[in-house]
């Protein structure tokens, strides 16, 4: 299995965002990782959908959108419309994870699931075959 490189733009300087995206476009990176935080599921707020739309216009790489938000299923159509290829939701934010994964796939994106550092990976045994990838956080979500 080939490792996938998906640099995050979480710590990018907005004044140089276009330049940073161009650098990623010229790199060997496979995807661009965009973290969207709502200040509810996680304590911080990050990019919103306008930034996702802007980055989608600039990049030649697939967009890996990581939603650290409550009720991510409400935003599936918007995330797809804004150009995401992979929609990554948190196990802890989705009481009906199977349904959310199915909705992401039906929208035409690759479903991915993230777990927090303290969440046992064994909790994913019933969903693992239904997702494109699993992201295991090495820090508590909301901090980069």
Regions found by a protein language model. Give the residues of each.
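Short gly/ser/thr-rich secondary-structure transition/capping motifs
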Residues: 114-118
């Amino acid at each position: 299995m080939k490792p996938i490189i998906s640099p995050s733009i979480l710590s990018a300087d907005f004044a140089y965002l276009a330049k940073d995206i161009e650098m990623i476009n010229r790199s060997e990176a496979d995807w661009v990782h965009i973290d969207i935080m709502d200040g509810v599921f996680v304590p911080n707020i990050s990019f919103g959908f306008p930034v996702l739309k802007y980055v989608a216009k600039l990049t030649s790489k697939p967009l890996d959108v990581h939603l650290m938000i409550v009720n991510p299923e409400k935003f599936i159509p918007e995330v797809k419309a804004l150009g995401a290829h992979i929609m990554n939701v948190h196990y802890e934010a989705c009481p009906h994870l199977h349904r959310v994964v199915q909705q992401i796939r039906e929208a035409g994106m690759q479903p991915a699931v993230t777990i927090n550092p303290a969440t046992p990976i064994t909790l994913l045994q019933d969903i693992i075959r239904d997702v494109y990838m699993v992201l295991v956080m090495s820090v508590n979500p909301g901090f980069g």
